[in-house]
Amino acid sequence: MNKAILHTIIIYTLASCPYCIKAKALLDEKNVVYEEIEVSNFTQEEKEKFIKKSGGKKTVPQIFIDNIHVGGCDALFDLEKEGRLDKLLEGQPKKKMPAAGA
């Protein structure tokens, strides 16, 4: 079994949300692969599932690492300040770096 498949980061966002942009920038800085899910076109049922999955939170971003709800942008940056984010991201797939000269 491929262990990389077990590791996932999902971030629920809105395109124009500055907190979403900031959270994605931190994840990009960490060079980890994440799945971004845009919530603006969610059906009512999808919205309800999102809110339930997010522990009642209706705001974005909402970030999940290995199916564990981390929280929003502030929570992500708090983990970084506390030195705990890198530990949570251990084993996450890294983004492929472009070849030299590409």
Curated annotation (Swiss-Prot):
The keyword Cytoplasm applies. Monomer. GO terms for biological process: cell redox homeostasis; cellular response to oxidative stress. One of its GO terms (cellular component) is cytoplasm. It is found in: Cytoplasm. InterPro entries: GLR_AS, Glutaredoxin, Glutaredoxin_subgr, GRX_bact, Thioredoxin-like_sf. Has a glutathione-disulfide oxidoreductase activity in the presence of NADPH and glutathione reductase. Reduces low molecular weight disulfides and proteins. This is Glutaredoxin 1. The gene is grxC1. NCBIfam families: GRX_bact (TIGR02181). Residues 1-96 form the Glutaredoxin domain.
